Amino acid sequence: MSTTAKLDPQVALAELRERKPDRVTIVVLSGSMDRVMSAFIIATGAASMGMQVTTFFTFWGLNVIRKPGLSSKARDWLRRAFGLLNRGGADTLPLSRFHFWGLGTRMMKLVMRRNRMPGVPELMDMAKDLGVRFIACTTTLGLMGITKDTLVEGIDQFAGVSTYLAEAKDAQVNLFI
C-alpha cells in the first residue's frame, strides 16, 4: 500500500468543520502613527484571510480610539492632566521617529496620500468592516483619566487583562505593538 494514500473527502470535511478558526491578538500599546498603522495592516490582513482578530488597546494605544481633541473628565487633577496632555484621535498620532514637531508626520501623510495608502482612520474602518474586535483596557482608562464617552464608536468591549489573556491563550498569533 502506498504511503501517500488519498484522504477520504468526508473525513477531510469533518476535520475542517471541527477545526477552530485561526486567531490573532494584538496588544496596541504604542500611540505612534507608524506602529499603529503596522498593527492595523496586520489586523486587516489577518481578518481578510479569515482569521479572528482581537485588538487590545492599552496605555498610549488608547489615544488611537479616543475622539479627537484634548478633553478629560477625570475628577482629580493628575489624571485630568494626563487626559489634557494626551491628544486623542487616530488622525493626530505622531511618528515614533523623525516627528520634528509634526513636520515628519505631515510629510509621511503626504507620501501616503500620493501613494494612495490609507491612513490610520481608514485602516480602523477597514478593520471594523472585516470584523476585527476592539477591546479598551479598563485599568488603563481609569489610570489615565480617560472616560468611555471620550472614545470613538465601535469599541466592542471594555475589559481588563484577564479578558485579553483568555483571548491570547487560544490564539495562534499574539503580537505586542
Predicted feature descriptions by range:
Residues M37-G50, T55:
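Histidine-anchored nucleotide/phosphate-binding helix
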Residues I26-V36, I65, V111-N115:
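Short, glycine-rich nucleotide/cofactor-binding loops
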Residues S2-L16:
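Positively charged, low-complexity intrinsically disordered leader regions
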Residues V53-F59, I135-T138:
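Short internal beta-strands
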